[in-house]
Structure formats: C-alpha cells, structure tokens
C-alpha cells in the first residue's frame, strides 16, 4: 500500500510536522541573521503553517466532540485546560 503524500494527509496528521517547521522558522527569524526579504518569506510561510496547525486543532476538537456525544456535538462544552497559574 502506498503512503499518503504530505499534500494528501489530513491536517490533523500533518500537525506535528507543521508545528516543528513553524518552530524552526521562529528560531531562524529570532537569530536576526536573515535578510529583510528572507524574513518576509519566512513570515509568510510561518503564517501558513500557523493556519495549518489551527485547522488541525479545530478538526481534532470536532472529532473529540463527536466521540463524546455523536448525537449532539454542538451541545458539548469547549475544552478549557486547567490553569497552571497557582
């Protein structure tokens, strides 16, 4: 069986890869060694990666809601992680 190409993989499956790429871009930009043009290109790519990550998280949340109550996914409460503010 052939592997899915990255372009055909679901956003949820690509989340880890997109997040890692985004983190690498941020590190490159924080060094300050990129030219203005390279910085703009990196920023544009970063925005695209951010959107992919956001879409993957939204799809994952929807899947969790559907699994929690398939009859009424809209009635489920949004997940609020516990605060670590001590």
From Swiss-Prot:
Signal sequence, renumbered to the chain: none
The keyword Hydrolase is assigned to this record: yes
Localization annotation: Cytoplasm
Keywords: Cytoplasm, Exonuclease, Hydrolase, Nuclease
SUPFAM superfamilies: XseB-like (SSF116842)
Matches recorded under Pfam families: Exonuc_VII_S
Top-rank taxon: Bacteria
Family: Belongs to the XseB family.
Function: Bidirectionally degrades single-stranded DNA into large acid-insoluble oligonucleotides, which are then degraded further into small acid-soluble oligonucleotides.
Subunit structure: Heterooligomer composed of large and small subunits.
Protein name: Exodeoxyribonuclease 7 small subunit
């Amino acid at each position: 069986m052939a592997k899915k190409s990255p372009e055909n993989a679901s956003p949820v499956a690509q989340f880890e890869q997109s997040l890692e790429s985004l983190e690498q871009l941020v590190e490159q930009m924080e060094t300050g060694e990129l030219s203005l043009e390279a910085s703009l290109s990196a920023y544009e790519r970063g925005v695209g990666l951010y959107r992919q990550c956001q879409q993957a998280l939204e799809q994952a949340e929807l899947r969790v809601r559907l699994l929690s109550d398939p009859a009424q996914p809209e009635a489920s409460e949004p997940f609020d992680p516990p605060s670590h503010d001590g």
